[in-house]
Design a protein with these regions (language model features):
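Non-heme Fe(II)/2-oxoglutarate
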Residues: 1-93
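A short glycine-rich, His/Asp/Glu-containing loop-to-beta-strand
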Residues: 86-106
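Intrinsically disordered, low-complexity regulatory regions enriched in Ser/Pro/Gly/Thr
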Residues: 93, 116-118, 165
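Structured loops at beta-to-helix junctions and adjacent beta-edge loops in soluble globular domains
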Residues: 40, 48-51, 104, 126-128, ...
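Catalytic core of Fe(II)/2-oxoglutarate
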Residues: 126-165
Length: 165
């Protein structure tokens, strides 16, 4: 079991977790935040019911809740999908909420935003296209350097933007 307080650490730290072999051809991609026509797609690792339709788990929860008169929160999306197997060791140890693979195509981006509050953090596993010639992640006025096939802890309290070339 993991027992440490990551909230005291820097904005981004590399974690020593096992390498995951992921067959990208087996993933089912759906438009991420479908109201925005940005070149980005997702595949659910967790969802409300274990299905991987992408609805509503790849949508903006604020917009989805408003349109459908629901009150979904990040932690409601905790049922593993068939794509969760490579991360079972982590899902068994952490209280994970909405989790997904993200694929940004050329020109794909996330504008300046803040996802959650002081008490949440993001665990990232980078697969491919994360070098400085492919991806720029700016957070807390710093460009974060990512590498392929690495695990990272990332604080959620800062505003950030991400661009893929």
């Amino acid at each position: 079991m993991f027992s440490f307080d990551l909230s005291v650490y820097e904005d981004l730290i590399e974690l020593e977790l096992p390498h995951c072999d992921i067959d990208l051809t087996s993933l089912e991609w759906h438009r991420y935040n479908p109201r925005k026509f940005v070149n980005r797609f997702g595949c659910s690792i967790t969802s409300l019911d274990g299905n991987d339709s992408g609805t509503p788990d790849l949508d903006s929860l604020i917009e989805y809740n408003r349109e459908h008169n629901t009150e979904y929160q990040e932690l409601d999306f905790k049922t593993p999908t068939k794509h969760a197997a490579p991360f079972k060791f982590l899902l068994d140890e952490l209280t994970c909420g909405r989790s997904h693979f993200l694929k940004l195509g050329t020109g794909g981006f996330f504008p300046w935003h803040r996802d959650n509050d002081l008490f949440t953090f993001r665990v990232l596993y980078t697969i491919e296209g994360c070098g400085s010639n492919d991806l720029v992640w700016v957070q807390n006025d710093k460009v974060l350097e990512l590498q392929n096939h690495k695990w990272y802890y990332c604080k959620e309290i800062y505003v950030r933007r991400i661009h893929f070339f």
